[in-house]
Design a protein with these regions (language model features):
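Short helix-initiation/N-cap motifs at beta->coil->alpha
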Residues: 85-94, 112, 185-190, 266-283
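Long, aromatic- and glycine/proline-rich binding clefts that accommodate carbohydrate-like moieties
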Residues: 364-411
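Extracytoplasmic/periplasmic substrate-recognition and gating elements
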Residues: 176, 258-259, 263, 301-368
Length: 452
């Protein structure tokens, strides 16, 4: 199966923290303006001309985007949209940094680039267009708004989102007499241990839940809402080491790993099928519970249609019960490239993709990602199964969290994730000292990009 470029896979193929800093420096060096442009007092009565759209989708998913583009052209007969599919973020940034005018609208799979694109002017400031056209930004949640702007500059608009939740196998639950999914991390561990089975040689046959950091969607970002983990302070520096929640979450996860055995978990995890294949361990019953995104519902429908499963918000830690029902959200973002030859037409297309209810619902149904406006989330035309409803509810929850844009892109999440994997292996040393080291690594990288 072809790898899908999304917020989840984008982070997997991204470079390390040094690479993120280097990319930011490259874009900064090649972008000298702020992205501010003169905007006409009124939007044109009639749209005409040619506008280019660069996006990362391929194959079936690209056809979904094309269908929405066709609708836009049908509503605006004088407009031609030149679509360039399969364009990843690295190419997008390089083309913009080179000063090319080939890109009008760029659609990215990751919010990791927002800090760079906004701060360097690689994407234009959209606020003048938003103000002029009186776009109702209140239809987009504060959290989603936060990951599509940087330090007061809105250079992107959100276009669909990924939301994470707990998946659980109803048949395995029923066999064990379990009637409800866990709501706390302690309940999650208790149920998981009850559902875990071993082979005669002591190796793991089935896991109730795999706590192993780095397995499938097991990341700090996805686990973080269980304690309301804070990433950055108001100045863009690391808040990880000073946050009260992260040590609680990390110690719970480490103790869970130790309860089963690091070596056993490592061996079991290494033998699991690929995440985006039919052999995904939740599909096969090797995992009774797992954390995953709304897109998993589409994979199950296609690859394991007989699987009897449910979804629920991911559990929260003791003392953080008020966060239950929330979760993690991140998504695709789109903006107008600084070299756009037709920014007015580019804005019209961007506004359509990011705020038109019919367009968002059509993309949501076709891609099985979560729409990013309240109107689209509540539209009767949105195809919502019982399992999918969980993700809608999480997206609408006021305490749902995200990873904020940064000058170092994904660098800060990668630095933390790297240390966490050492900690779970027992090689991370003292936790407080380790987190202080993570803070220092992140802050040094922010200073490197920020300059004197």
């Amino acid at each position: 199966m072809q790898q899908r470029f999304t917020p989840r896979t984008g982070r997997r193929i991204a470079a390390g923290i040094a690479g993120a800093a280097a990319a930011a420096l490259m874009l900064t060096a090649c972008s000298g303006d702020t992205g501010s442009v003169d905007v006409a007092d009124e939007a044109p009565d009639e749209l005409s001309g040619t506008v280019s759209l660069w996006h990362f989708f391929t194959d079936r998913e690209a056809s979904v985007i094309q269908g929405v583009v066709d609708d836009f052209e049908a509503q605006n007969p004088g407009v031609t949209v030149e679509v360039h599919e399969g364009q990843d973020d690295e190419k997008l940034r390089k083309v913009i940094a080179a000063g090319s005018d080939d890109i009008d609208v760029g659609l990215s799979y990751s919010t990791d680039v927002v800090g760079n694109l906004c701060s360097t002017g690689a994407f234009r400031d959209l606020q003048p267009y938003i103000d002029r056209d009186e776009v109702d930004m209140s239809q987009i949640s504060d959290t989603v708004q936060s990951y599509s702007e940087f330090e007061g500059t809105r250079c992107t608009m959100p276009v669909l989102a990924d939301v994470n939740a707990l998946f659980y196998n109803k048949d395995i639950f029923a066999e064990a007499g379990i009637t409800e999914p866990p709501k706390t991390l302690d309940e999650l561990e208790d149920i998981a241990l009850k559902l875990t089975e071993y082979n005669d040689d002591g190796s793991i046959k089935r896991l109730g839940f795999n706590p192993f950091m780095g397995m499938y969607e097991n990341t700090a970002a996805h686990f973080g809402p269980a304690v309301g983990g804070k990433w950055l302070d108001d100045d863009g520096y690391s808040a990880i080491g000073s946050d009260e929640g992260w040590p609680v979450l990390m110690q719970w996860q480490k103790d869970f790993v130790d309860e089963i055995g690091y070596d056993k978990l490592q061996a079991f995890t290494a033998g699991l099928g690929q995440e985006f294949s039919a052999d995904n361990a939740f599909h096969t019953g090797q995992l009774a519970m797992t954390i995953d995104g709304e897109y998993r519902t589409a994979f199950i429908a296609d690859q394991a249609p007989d699987l009897n499963y449910g979804t629920a918000p991911f559990p929260t830690a003791t003392g953080f019960e008020d966060l239950y029902g929330a979760g993690y959200i991140v998504g695709n973002i789109a903006g107008i490239a600084k070299g756009s030859k037709n920014p007015e037409l580019a804005w019209a297309l961007l506004k359509y993709l990011s705020t038109d209810t019919d367009a968002l619902v059509k993309m949501g149904n076709g891609l099985k990602n979560v729409p990013t406006t309240t109107a689209a989330l509540e539209s009767p035309d949105l195809e919502v199964s019982e399992q999918y409803q969980t993700f809608i509810d999480i997206a609408l929850h006021p305490k749902t969290a995200t990873t904020p844009p940064s000058l170092v892109g994904a660098g800060y999440t990668q630095a933390f994730g790297s240390y966490w994997e050492k900690f779970q292996a027992g090689t991370g040393g003292n936790l407080a000292e380790g987190l202080a080291g993570v803070d220092q690594e992140i802050n040094d990288s922010v200073d490197l990009v920020s300059g004197p």
